[in-house]
């Protein structure tokens, strides 16, 4: 079952990305390196609750 999630920047805490994940394959919180438009660089983004 795929679920829509929001990714939050770890440095500026802005929620800029929406994505989906499969809870059966990835039960933990998702962490991806994505581009932050506020900081103009690639930063770690974490799944929000």
Swiss-Prot record:
GO molecular function, one term: structural constituent of ribosome
GO biological process, one term: translation
UniProt-listed Pfam families: Ribosomal_L33 (PF00471)
Single GO cellular component term: ribosome
Family annotation (InterPro entries): Ribosomal_bL33, Ribosomal_bL33_CS, Ribosomal_bL33_sf, Ribosomal_zn-bd
Transmembrane parts of this sequence: none
Keywords, ordered alphabetically: Ribonucleoprotein, Ribosomal protein
Gene3D superfamilies, sorted: Ribosomal protein L33
Family membership noted in the UniProt record: Belongs to the bacterial ribosomal protein bL33 family.
Protein name: Large ribosomal subunit protein bL33B
Organism, scientific name: Limosilactobacillus fermentum (strain NBRC 3956 / LMG 18251) (Lactobacillus fermentum)
């Amino acid at each position: 079952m795929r679920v829509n999630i929001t990714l939050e920047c770890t440095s500026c805490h802005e929620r800029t990305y929406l994505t989906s994940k499969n809870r059966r394959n990835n039960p933990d919180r998702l962490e991806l390196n994505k581009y932050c438009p506020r900081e103009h660089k690639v930063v770690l983004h974490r799944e929000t609750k």
